[in-house]
UniProtKB/Swiss-Prot annotation:
Its EC number is 2.1.1.-. The keyword NAD does not apply. Keywords: Cytoplasm, Methyltransferase, rRNA processing, S-adenosyl-L-methionine, Transferase. The lineage of its organism: Bacteria, Bacillati, Bacillota, Bacilli, Lactobacillales. It comes from Streptococcus pneumoniae (strain ATCC 700669 / Spain 23F-1). This is Ribosomal RNA small subunit methyltransferase G. Specifically methylates the N7 position of a guanine in 16S rRNA. InterPro entries: rRNA_ssu_MeTfrase_G, SAM-dependent_MTases_sf. Belongs to the methyltransferase superfamily. RNA methyltransferase RsmG family. It holds the Pfam family GidB.
Length: 237
């Protein structure tokens, strides 16, 4: 997808980009490729592929009408090179975005990126999702948690639901269909007092299938969740 195609598709969906936003995406691409040579950020470095499979793919929650352009608190778990939250932040500057990532080198990249793109209202923390979720400054503080290709729902739910306010939503972006995954996650979702609200399916402009599973938090998460770092993966609920 050429940058012009990206701009046009957004304009068609009533999301026209300003020159500044176009420049932000362009600089994002340049820094991604430059830093990818120092630290492994992505296997996708071709410009048209980045615009399609990283930028366009990341803004799906906005295109699907799931996220408003308001000062809401969004947490992105395991964002890697900033996907999906930072492309959404460029598009919707009002969003207040926090990223937690377990690799310090990636956090360094994200801090530089935010500086270069002049993004305000972005916060980066180095560490494990399981640890931060037990910190009262993070637990039950967010309207949305996003995770793109991070883990199966059975594991992902324990890593993310504790961060949500009651009524808040987890948006899990996936490239493969999730019905059997949701069956496996049924017990975990019940224990975490959360419920699958929707499982949206759509296609990228190149026809690649994509899914967003929307999970709503119904009640406060029991204090024992999430368990210690590594446990959700080792012994899923």
């Amino acid at each position: 997808m050429k940058p012009e195609t990206f701009y046009n598709l957004l304009a068609e969906q009533n999301l026209p980009l300003s020159d500044q936003q176009k420049e932000q995406f362009e600089r994002y691409f340049e820094l991604l490729v430059e830093w990818n040579e120092k630290i492994n950020l992505t296997a996708i470095t071709d410009k048209e592929e980045v615009y399609l499979k990283h930028f366009y793919d990341s803004i799906a929650p906005i295109l699907q009408g799931l996220i408003p352009n308001e000062t809401i608190k969004l947490l992105d778990i395991g964002a890697g090179a900033g996907f999906p939250s930072l492309p959404m932040k460029i598009l919707y500057p009002e969003l207040d975005v926090t990223i937690i990532d377990s690799l310090n080198k990636r956090i360094n990249f994200l801090q530089l990126l935010a500086q270069e793109l002049d993004l305000n209202g972005v916060h980066f923390y180095h560490g494990r999702a399981e640890d931060f979720a037990q910190d009262k400054n993070f637990r039950a503080q967010y309207d949305f948690v996003t995770a793109r290709a991070v883990a199966r729902m059975q594991v992902l739910s324990e890593l993310t639901i504790p961060y949500l306010k009651v009524g808040g939503k987890l948006l899990a972006l996936k490239a493969s269909n999730a019905p059997e995954e949701l069956l496996e996650a049924k017990n975990a979702l019940n224990l975490l007092f959360s419920k699958v609200e929707d499982n949206l399916s759509y296609a990228l402009p190149n026809r690649d299938p994509r899914y967003i599973t929307v999970v709503e938090k119904k009640k406060e998460t029991p204090n024992k969740y999430p368990r210690k770092a590594g446990m959700p993966n080792k012994r899923p609920l």
